[in-house]
Amino acid sequence: MPDHIPLPAKQYSVIYADPPWAYQQAGATAKARGTAVKHYPTMTTAEICALPVREIVREGAACFMWATFPNITEAIKVMEAWGFTYKTAAFVWVKKNRKQGGNFMGLGAYTRANAEVCLLGVTPGFKAKTQIRAHNVHQIIEAPFEGHSKKPDETRQRIVELLGDVPRLEM
């Protein structure tokens, strides 16, 4: 397993994750394959699954995990390995072009990709009836694309609005 920063020895109610996927989609253009490794060290799905996240989550915790559509199956595997049960897509980020304001056009094997999803999983003991603090948090986030792997700051704000200012770890 590649070296990684040890996880803090605390207990968290929210994990906000954008795993460093070793993304190698068959059929994608040569330009699109393996772009993450140009920006940061990546990990295989098995390596991400092996991170000791289970050890730092409280009972009834929530995980918000970013994934691209072709990688959703892998993201759900990681959630399960970390002790979470997939529930839904918490957020769908529609990437906007910074300069023209229209929709950003990314790469893709089948269609030109734009949106990314932030999946939601929970651990046993999560009580939506009492833990969800706001029922007006929208799923769609329209925000500019600001560079590889940079997610909209608005996502963090929506997580706090949804679940409150609880102990959370961004990884």
PLM regions: where:
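Class I S-adenosyl-L-methionine-dependent methyltransferase catalytic core
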Residues: 1-171
